[in-house]
């Protein structure tokens, strides 16, 4: 998931040996998802010319480079996934998701790696990228798994919205409690 200090957190991952475990997992053809700082870590390099969190080599699972910027991007975002390559994430093709971005930096394709034949698929322009084999996906979109459409696409189950859950709870309370009971239970002594 996300990280407030991407380069520092990546150094911690390396100290724990988790970088090798993530890379091995991807090399075995298993799915990897990076969100926000996780997306930045999946790239080739983190470049910090403003002294925000330091330069660092990435995990190298996506041919991307992130350049940290002093201004933080904070915005609600609605994104529709384009064609997602075959693999663990292909069910997201065409799915609309609501979320938010909150990050320092801009991420883009690593031009030298693309020139050398690396494959990168941009599934949401400027927001989500996928590896050539389809198993590694990185996105800036926080809240991905709070979207019923995303959960439906990925896991095939009807997932109720939070609003539906709260409506059900309210109905239950109305049926089983006398008016004023909850207010009396929560009133200060």
What are these regions (language model features)?
Residues 126-189:
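Acyltransferase
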Residues 20, 33, 40, 57, ...:
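Feature representing long, continuous alpha-helical segments
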Residues 39, 66, 104-106, 143-145:
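Glycine-rich beta-alpha junction loops
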Residues 1, 103, 140:
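Short beta-strand segments
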Residues 85-134:
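Catalytic beta-strand/loop cores that center a nucleophilic Ser/Cys/Thr
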Residues 4-98:
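Cysteine-nucleophile active-site neighborhood
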Residues 20, 29, 33, 66-69, ...:
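Short secondary-structure junctions and interdomain/linker hinges
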């Amino acid at each position: 998931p996300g990280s407030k200090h991407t380069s520092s957190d990546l150094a911690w991952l390396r100290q724990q040996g988790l970088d090798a475990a993530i890379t091995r997992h991807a090399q075995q053809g298993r799915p990897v998802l990076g969100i926000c700082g996780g997306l930045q870590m999946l790239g080739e390099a983190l470049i910090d010319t403003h002294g925000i969190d330091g330069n660092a080599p990435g995990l190298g699972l996506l041919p991307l480079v992130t350049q940290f910027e002093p201004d933080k991007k904070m915005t609600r975002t609605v994104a529709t996934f384009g064609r997602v390559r075959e693999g663990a994430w292909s069910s997201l093709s065409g799915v609309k998701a609501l979320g938010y971005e909150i990050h320092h930096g801009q991420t883009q394709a690593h031009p030298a790696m693309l020139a050398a034949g690396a494959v990168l698929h941009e599934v949401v322009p400027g927001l989500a990228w996928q590896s050539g084999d389809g198993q590694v996906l990185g996105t800036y979109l926080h809240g991905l798994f709070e979207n019923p459409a995303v959960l439906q696409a990925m896991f095939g189950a009807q997932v109720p919205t939070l609003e539906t859950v709260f409506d059900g709870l309210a109905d239950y309370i109305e049926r089983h409690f006398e008016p004023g009971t909850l207010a009396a239970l929560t009133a200060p002594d």
